[in-house]
Design a protein with these regions (language model features):
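Active-site neighborhoods and metal-handling regions in enzymes and metal-associated proteins
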Residues: 1-402
Length: 402
């Protein structure tokens, strides 16, 4: 109502879920097949995937009164243009806007296929950016959303416990991904969007994807677990060492944690994203030519129905375009630091709820110091050091307390 828009047309599944409280599964996330219209001053109208429309009419009473309808778009180009689906969608939208006297007002659109956008223009409908309005609406979480985000984070504690116990020489990154995914689906996750499992020399630079690399003694290993419970997501990194940690890795972890803790300590209503980003290191301080080249490594972002929501915190965008932090935001803060050995690195992330008086960290798997996973090794004189160089001649190997 605060905008100039006559309505919002949404194909983004997360926006549709926010507006209509309907969902047909994560398989539909990237299909652009479903669409909804939220007219100014009225209730939403949903055009759903075939029989899903009838299902929602029966079981979603808030979508009653003929507002849950069947309607098919272009399925990201899978339907041939000559079938006329783009024109059909445009006519449907125009008819609803005209009935409410809104056809002359700008229509906010989030994501759309170009043939549908062109068809709307031919019908005289001016499409404008509606994604910013939706992001603004989703920025502050309701109490129910906060409960769901907390529950989703709680669920990730379990795969981290299992990963910690399972990591040892000989297992592969993809096996760790399978373990995390199995654990979450067994607990009721509706979608494990991604498990980044990164080990050894793959840690720096961060590749953002797992492989079948075998874990070896002394490897660093970090994970990001992204999943959805009742629509609400996590972004939750943890770093480990396998069997033992090198002094360089321990130092990198301390540095990574320090940058993260500084950001967490600042989180309260009234500060800005620029305040936080300014406390993080410049790209050149950790081996990158500019902020775009290291985007996402010293990073903050809202978490909700999608894993990246407003506000975004980065030296790339926040210093010149600050956003004020408000109570009710849930923000993931993630930091990275490469080790001096040239291949190890640490990566940690915490999800933070901004409260009226400060903040609450909702990701609870231990991360204040580097955890060493795997069975301890024993020598003839006692336990092998948990902090040791991979090459004994460099010092740090042998028995004794860590």
């Amino acid at each position: 109502e605060a905008s100039e828009l006559g309505g919002l047309l949404c194909f983004d599944m997360y926006n549709i879920r926010y507006i209509t409280s309907t969902n047909i599964g994560e398989w539909a996330r990237d299909k652009l097949s479903r669409f909804c219209l939220l007219p100014r001053g009225d209730e939403p109208i949903m055009w759903d995937f075939g029989s899903a429309a009838k299902h929602h009419e029966l079981y979603c009473p808030w979508m009653g009164g003929g507002r849950s309808r069947a309607g098919i778009s272009l399925l990201r180009g899978a339907v041939a243009p000559e079938a006329g689906r783009a024109e059909d969608v445009a006519r449907k939208i125009k008819r609803e806007l005209e009935m409410r006297g809104l056809a002359k007002a700008p229509l906010g659109v989030d994501v759309i296929e170009l043939p549908i956008y062109a068809a709307l223009q031919k019908e005289g409908i001016a499409g404008v950016d509606g994604q910013q309005l939706m992001q603004a609406a989703r920025r502050i979480k309701t109490p129910d959303e906060i409960v769901l985000l907390n529950t989703a984070a709680m669920m990730v504690d379990a795969p981290y416990e299992k990963l910690y116990r399972a990591m040892r020489p000989g297992v592969r990154e993809n096996e760790m991904v399978a373990l995390a995914a199995h654990t979450l689906y067994s607990m009721g996750s509706e979608d494990v969007e991604g498990v980044n499992a990164i080990a050894g020399e793959r840690c720096s630079p961060h590749p953002h994807i797992f492989s079948d690399r075998v874990l070896r003694p002394g490897d660093p290993a970090y994970y990001d677990i992204i999943h959805s419970y009742m629509g609400y997501r996590t972004c939750y990194y943890r770093s480990f060492a396998v069997g033992s940690a090198s002094p360089a890795m321990v130092d990198a972890y301390k540095r990574c944690r320090e940058y993260l803790d500084v950001a967490i300590a600042m989180m309260k209503p009234g500060i800005t994203t620029a305040d936080i980003a300014s406390m993080w290191p410049r790209a050149q301080e950790f081996g990158f030519p500019d902020e775009e080249a290291c985007f996402g490594l010293q990073y903050g972002h809202g978490v909700g129905l999608s894993v990246w929501e407003q506000p975004v915190i980065s030296r790339l965008v926040s210093l010149d375009h600050p956003v004020t932090i408000e109570a009710g935001m849930v923000i993931a803060l993630e930091t990275f630091w490469p080790a001096s050995d040239g291949w190890s690195a640490a990566r940690i992330e915490e999800e933070v709820l901004v409260t009226e008086t400060g903040h609450e960290v909702i990701t609870r798997f231990p991360a204040e110091t580097l955890l060493v996973a795997g069975a301890p090794y024993w020598t003839g004189t006692g336990p092998l050091n948990a902090i040791r160089e991979l090459e004994p001649g460099l010092g740090g190997a042998g028995a004794g307390a860590p």
